[in-house]
């Protein structure tokens, strides 16, 4: 019994002097562990007489309980002390200025798209959307693009299979609309389009807005006036020189491309306009009769007017960006300028 009480006395002294949780763990191992002093005494009970064994076992277990209680109390005290030290070390100086939340903003392409859409909606255009994965009929055939046309080549178009492609323009949306909606029609079709091209002025994915008017009295003069008004409103220039040059597109006849006087040098000639003083901004024309026939619209009764605008192109000109790829690199230093 004297040995047992001595173990308890030593444990009390050690627990009282313990400075951290590791000290307590060392004591627990030395006294209560598998090879601890009390465990060894319990294993030796078999050597005692039947009369001594119960009393000794009871005494050892009582000492064990007392030590466990002392350990638990001391552990709680040490944990509280450690927590107080942590609070002191991590205290917050409430006098420091607060951290401002980083404000997000729209991407310049989204800003440009919204601006273009709002200008056309004010002119009674309806915004329509369509699938980005198209079949050859909607992307090529219905738009009077023959099978031998270079635009159908593998090096220009992304093919899923022989008949399925990533759309190369948003014109298929116009065909789908005309299948469901009879004239008069006045729509714009914005969205992503895909072509196999990558340099400072081209990316494999870019954005377009294509417009379509189908009505009995539509004419090219009407289209020309509409686009001139749009360009002047977009660039916020009441006086903006615009010229139309003859061009060729399979889905329009006649076809034209519109140039504006360089907004960088005011027509004097610079690197952006390649010293020409003019910048190409869009393509347009009168819808080819074959396109109207593909959706069962009589080209003798109705006339279609179409135009296509590259959103990145207009964004580059408005914001003075000289490399198209900057729009897609997700560099916060670049994007922050447009907030």
Curated annotation (Swiss-Prot):
Short name of any one Pfam family annotated for the protein: tRNA-synt_2d
Cofactor names: Mg(2+)
GO BP terms, alphabetized: phenylalanyl-tRNA aminoacylation
Subcellular location: Cytoplasm
Transmembrane spans: none
Superkingdom in the source lineage: Bacteria
Keywords from the UniProt entry: Aminoacyl-tRNA synthetase, ATP-binding, Cytoplasm, Ligase, Magnesium, Metal-binding, Nucleotide-binding, Protein biosynthesis
Keyword Ligase part of the UniProt annotation: yes
Disulphide bond pairs: none
The reaction(s) this protein catalyses: tRNA(Phe) + L-phenylalanine + ATP = L-phenylalanyl-tRNA(Phe) + AMP + diphosphate + H(+)
Positions with a binding annotation for Mg(2+): 253
EC number: 6.1.1.20
Cellular component annotations (GO), alphabetically ordered: cytoplasm
Free-text remark on how the cofactor is bound: Binds 2 magnesium ions per tetramer.
Main location: cytoplasm
UniProt-recorded Gene Ontology molecular function terms: ATP binding; magnesium ion binding; phenylalanine-tRNA ligase activity; tRNA binding
Family that this chain belongs to: Belongs to the class-II aminoacyl-tRNA synthetase family. Phe-tRNA synthetase alpha subunit type 1 subfamily.
Subunit structure: Tetramer of two alpha and two beta subunits.
Protein name: Phenylalanine--tRNA ligase alpha subunit
Organism, as annotated: Ruthia magnifica subsp. Calyptogena magnifica
Annotated gene: pheS
């Amino acid at each position: 019994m004297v040995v047992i009480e001595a173990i308890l006395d030593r444990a009390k002294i050690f627990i009282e002097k313990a400075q951290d949780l590791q000290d307590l763990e060392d004591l627990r191992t030395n006294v209560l562990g598998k090879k601890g002093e009390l465990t060894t005494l319990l294993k030796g009970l078999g050597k005692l007489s039947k009369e001594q064994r119960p009393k000794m076992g009871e005494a050892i277990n009582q000492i064990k309980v007392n030590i466990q209680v002392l350990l638990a109390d001391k552990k709680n005290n040490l944990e509280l002390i450690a927590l107080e030290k942590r609070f002191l070390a991590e205290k917050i100086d409430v006098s420091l200025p607060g951290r401002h939340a980083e404000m997000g903003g729209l991407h310049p392409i989204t800003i440009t798209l919204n601006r273009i859409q709002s200008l056309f909606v004010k002119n009674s255009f309806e915004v329509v959307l369509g699938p980005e994965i198209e079949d050859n009929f909607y992307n090529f055939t219905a738009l009077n693009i023959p099978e031998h046309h270079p635009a159908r080549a593998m090096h220009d178009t992304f093919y899923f299979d022989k008949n399925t492609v990533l759309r190369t323009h948003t014109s298929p949306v116009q065909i789908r609309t005309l299948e469901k909606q009879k004239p008069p029609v006045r729509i714009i079709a914005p969205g992503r389009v895909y072509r196999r091209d990558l340099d400072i002025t081209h990316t494999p994915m870019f954005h377009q807005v294509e417009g379509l008017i189908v009505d009995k009295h539509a004419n090219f003069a009407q289209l020309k006036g509409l686009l001139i008004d749009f360009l002047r409103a977009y660039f916020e220039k009441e006086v903006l020189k615009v010229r139309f040059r003859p061009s060729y597109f399979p889905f329009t006849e006649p076809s034209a491309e519109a140039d504006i006087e360089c907004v960088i040098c005011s027509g004097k000639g610079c690197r952006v306009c390649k010293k020409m003083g003019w910048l190409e901004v869009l393509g347009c024309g009168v819808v080819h009769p074959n396109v109207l026939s593909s959706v069962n619209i009589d080209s003798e009764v109705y006339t279609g007017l179409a135009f296509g605008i590259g959103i990145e192109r207009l964004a580059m000109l408005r914001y003075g960006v000289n490399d198209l790829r900057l729009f897609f690199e997700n560099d916060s230093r670049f994007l922050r300028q447009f907030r």
